[in-house]
């Protein structure tokens, strides 16, 4: 029997996503499994929440409109929130994009490609954040 590699640290998961339907889907799936969720509708809002609060992990879309995208959120976390460096999951509908491929290859951060199923999401969430 192997030990779970990631332990749940408690606290909410920060969900950074600009599409309301994806936010609703992710929030419902995570809350059904016992996670609490705080959402941010843009990368800028996500950075504000990260600056002010404590989170167990972050799930962020890579491509979002506005001044701050998911790659920039990822870079900010690496620099400013070392406790979250390995507790990030990226989501993207465009993993064929060369910038996205470079980010994923260089960072080793888990990425879930849209569209995805609840079980696929939860498998990555539990491996990355642990179970509540």
What are these regions (language model features)?
Residues 48, 69-84:
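Short amphipathic alpha-helix used as the core "switch/output" element in two-component signaling
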